[in-house]
Amino acid sequence: MKAALVIMAAGMGSRYGGNKQVDGIGPNGEILMEYSIFAALRAGFTKVVFIIKPDMRDLMENMVGHHLAARKTADGENVEVCYAYQDFSSVPDFYTVPSDRVKPFGTVHALLCAREFVHAPFVVINADDYYGVDAFKTIYAELSKLAESGEGTMVGYDLCNTVSEHGTVTRGVCHVNEQGMLDRVGETFHLKPCDDGKIRDIQENGDGPVYAPETPVSMNFW
């Protein structure tokens, strides 16, 4: 089955202080998204779509695009590589973008910018998160089942495996019904493991709501 990996890499990186999507971290200078790409190719994905800012094109091609285009898929075919620009030209006519808006909108805006490059089952991920090899195998298998129905799926993670002792994180807390289906995702902004061993949302204060370690959360892997 042909399937596309759509990578959202147009984030401004303002909290990080630069373009964390293209900072090398591996032994040979690999950037974080390369680990996702290689895991996806091994799982069976055949196409990679980068959603970027226009001024990132040369940087992305030099760091990832050129050698990725030379790689083969699991079936021995060339990997198809595309670049979609996240700008306001894709915003629907019924919405007026504020004149002083510079920063791109979120996930839906990113996907709108990539729609002309996606004509097969696809998944969308963040450029600056690590998802693990097994996650790509799992979601590729699910895509194979869902391809005809047009339905969607998501890879979820236990909250305890996605928080950091070095600061707060934002996670999409998943609310799942008795049938194991996702009802909704609530974005929660200041999750942190506290000194008493409990994970809390400390947005309002240090004694905020407690979340169970196994609470399913979204890392934006749809």
State where each predicted segment sits.
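Conserved core of the sugar-phosphate nucleotidyltransferase
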Residues: 133-222
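Conserved adenylation A10 loop of the ANL superfamily
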Residues: 9-15
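Conserved catalytic-core motifs of eukaryotic protein kinase domains, centered on the activation segment
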Residues: 18-19
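Short, flexible active-site-adjacent loop segments at beta-strand->alpha-helix junctions, enriched
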Residues: 87-89, 128, 158, 180
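Conserved N-terminal catalytic core of the sugar/cofactor nucleotidyltransferase
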Residues: 1-4, 13, 27-124, 131-138, ...
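Short beta-strand segments
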Residues: 8-9, 82-84, 124-126, 154-158
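Short, flexible coil/turn micro-motifs enriched in small/turn-prone residues
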Residues: 6-8, 101, 151
